[in-house]
C-alpha cells in the first residue's frame, strides 16, 4: 500500500510545482528573470526560429507583425514571448486577459489607444466572451471596429479605423478557441515542455541574476525535477537557495538541492504531492483505471480544469498516465514508481 497520510495532507493551493502564478510578488520576481530578447530565450527552438524570421521580415517591410497565437501548458514562456515580440519589434505592449474583457467597450478602449504596430497581448484568450470576440474579428482582419452609440431607436453604428497592430493571444486550451478566431492568426506556435538540459541552462542563468552560488550538478538536480517548466524551475531555485543559506554554506550542490527538494516533497522524478495523490487515487481507489475525470476530481478534491490543464499534461508527457476513450488509466510506469506490481492488461 502507498502511504497516504502525507499525500492527502497538503493543500493544493500550497503546491510549489504548480506552473500557475502564485502571487503578485512572485510575478515581479519572474519578470526580473525573464529573457528580454530572442537571443536570450532558451528552448522552444521551432517557435523561436519562426518568430525570428517573421519579425525580421515585418521590420524590413515596415509592417506590423502578423497576429500570433501561442498555446501550450502553463509556465512555458507564452507571456515572456509576447514581451519579447514587442521588444524585438520596437513597439509598446498592452496586456490584458480574456476574463477581464467583459464588455465590447473594454476591448474597444484598448484597441483605440494602440499606436501603429503596437502589440496587444491577451492571455487566456479562449475565455473571451462571444460579444467581445465579435468585435475582435474585424479588428484583426480589417483594422476596424464597429461600435454602437446610444441606445434604443436612436442607437447607431459607428465604424472606427484602427492603426495596424499585432494581437498575441495565449492559451492553455487551444481546442476551446472558436474556428473563426483561430483562423485569424497568421502565426501559430505550440510551446512544448523543456528537456533537462534546456532547464539547466535556464536555472544557471537565473542563478547568475539572483547571485546564487550553484554547481553544475546542483543546477541539473533542480532542472530535472522541474516538470519541464521554466516557471517551476525558477521557483524551486529560489527555495533551494533559501535552504542552502540556512542549512549549508550557501552553495547549491547536488546534495543540497536533493535535500531541499525532498523537504519540499518533490521526488526525484519531479512528482509532487498532487501528482502522487492523483496517481495513487487511480491506482488504489479505481484499480488503475479506466476512470472518468469527474470521479478522479471528486476523489482528490480538485477541479476538472485544474486536473486537465495543470496536473495531467506532465504526467501524460512523462508516461505515468493515459487518457483513453474509457477514461484515465495509470501506466506500468506509474505502478513501478510506487513499487506496485503492474496490473495485467
Curated annotation (Swiss-Prot):
Top EC class for this record: hydrolase
Region described as Small ATPAse domain (RuvB-S): 195-265
The reaction(s) this protein catalyses: ATP + H2O = ADP + phosphate + H(+)
One GO BP: DNA repair
EC annotation from Swiss-Prot or TrEMBL: 3.6.4.-
Binding site for ATP: 33-34, 75, 78-80, 141-143, 184, 194, 231
Binding site for DNA: 323, 328
InterPro entries: AAA+_ATPase, AAA_lid_4, DNA_helicase_Holl-junc_RuvB, P-loop_NTPase, RuvB-like_N, RuvB_C, WH-like_DNA-bd_sf, WH_DNA-bd_sf
Major localization class: cytoplasm
Compartments where found: Cytoplasm
Function: The RuvA-RuvB-RuvC complex processes Holliday junction (HJ) DNA during genetic recombination and DNA repair, while the RuvA-RuvB complex plays an important role in the rescue of blocked DNA replication forks via replication fork reversal (RFR). RuvA specifically binds to HJ cruciform DNA, conferring on it an open structure. The RuvB hexamer acts as an ATP-dependent pump, pulling dsDNA into and through the RuvAB complex. RuvB forms 2 homohexamers on either side of HJ DNA bound by 1 or 2 RuvA tetramers; 4 subunits per hexamer contact DNA at a time.
Origin species: Chromobacterium violaceum (strain ATCC 12472 / DSM 30191 / JCM 1249 / CCUG 213 / NBRC 12614 / NCIMB 9131 / NCTC 9757 / MK)
Stretches for region Head domain (RuvB-H): 268-345
The name this protein goes by in its record: Holliday junction branch migration complex subunit RuvB
SMART domains: AAA
GO annotations of cellular component type: cytoplasm; Holliday junction resolvase complex
GO molecular function: ATP binding; ATP hydrolysis activity; four-way junction DNA binding; four-way junction helicase activity
Span list, region Large ATPase domain (RuvB-L): 4-194
Positions bound to Mg(2+): 79
Domain notes: Has 3 domains, the large (RuvB-L) and small ATPase (RuvB-S) domains and the C-terminal head (RuvB-H) domain. The head domain binds DNA, while the ATPase domains jointly bind ATP, ADP or are empty depending on the state of the subunit in the translocation cycle. During a single DNA translocation step the structure of each domain remains the same, but their relative positions change.
Gene3D superfamilies: 1.10.8.60, P-loop containing nucleotide triphosphate hydrolases, Winged helix-like DNA-binding domain superfamily/Winged helix DNA-binding domain
Amino acid at each position: 500500500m502507498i502511504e497516504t497520510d502525507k499525500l492527502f495532507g497538503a493543500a493544493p493551493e500550497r503546491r510549489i510545482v504548480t506552473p500557475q502564478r502564485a502571487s503578485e510578488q512572485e510575478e515581479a520576481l519572474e519578470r526580473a528573470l525573464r529573457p528580454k530578447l530572442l537571443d536570450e530565450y532558451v528552448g522552444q527552438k521551432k517557435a523561436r526560429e519562426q518568430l525570428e524570421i517573421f519579425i525580421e521580415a515585418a521590420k524590413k517591410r515596415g509592417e506590423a507583425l502578423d497576429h500570433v497565437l501561442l498555446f501550450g501548458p502553463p509556465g512555458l514562456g507564452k507571456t515572456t514571448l509576447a514581451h519579447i515580440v514587442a521588444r524585438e519589434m520596437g513597439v509598446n505592449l498592452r496586456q490584458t486577459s480574456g476574463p477581464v474583457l467583459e464588455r465590447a467597450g473594454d476591448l474597444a478602449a484598448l484597441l483605440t489607444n494602440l499606436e501603429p504596430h503596437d502589440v496587444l497581448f491577451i492571455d487566456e484568450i479562449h475565455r473571451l466572451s462571444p460579444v467581445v470576440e465579435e468585435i475582435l474579428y474585424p479588428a484583426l482582419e480589417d483594422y476596424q471596429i464597429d461600435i454602437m452609440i446610444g441606445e434604443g431607436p436612436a442607437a447607431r453604428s459607428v465604424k472606427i479605423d484602427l492603426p495596424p497592430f499585432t494581437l498575441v493571444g495565449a492559451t492553455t486550451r487551444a481546442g476551446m478557441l472558436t474556428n473563426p478566431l483561430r483562423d485569424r492568426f497568421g502565426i501559430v506556435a505550440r510551446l512544448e515542455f523543456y528537456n533537462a538540459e534546456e532547464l539547466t541552462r535556464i536555472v544557471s542563468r537565473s542563478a547568475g541574476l539572483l547571485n546564487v552560488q550553484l554547481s553544475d550538478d546542483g543546477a541539473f538536480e533542480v532542472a530535472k525535477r522541474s516538470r519541464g517548466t521554466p516557471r517551476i524551475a525558477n521557483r524551486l531555485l529560489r527555495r533551494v537557495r533559501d535552504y542552502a543559506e540556512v542549512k549549508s554554506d550557501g552553495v547549491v550542490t547536488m546534495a543540497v538541492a536533493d535535500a531541499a527538494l525532498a523537504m519540499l516533497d518533490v521526488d526525484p522524478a519531479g512528482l509532487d504531492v498532487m501528482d502522487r495523490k492523483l496517481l495513487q487515487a487511480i491506482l488504489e481507489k479505481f484499480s488503475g483505471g479506466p476512470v472518468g475525470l469527474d470521479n478522479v476530481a471528486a476523489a482528490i478534491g480538485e477541479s476538472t480544469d485544474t486536473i486537465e490543464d495543470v496536473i495531467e499534461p506532465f504526467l501524460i508527457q512523462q508516461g505515468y498516465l493515459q487518457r483513453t476513450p474509457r477514461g484515465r488509466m495509470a501506466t506500468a510506469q506509474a505502478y513501478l514508481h510506487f513499487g506496485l506490481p503492474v496490473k495485467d492488461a
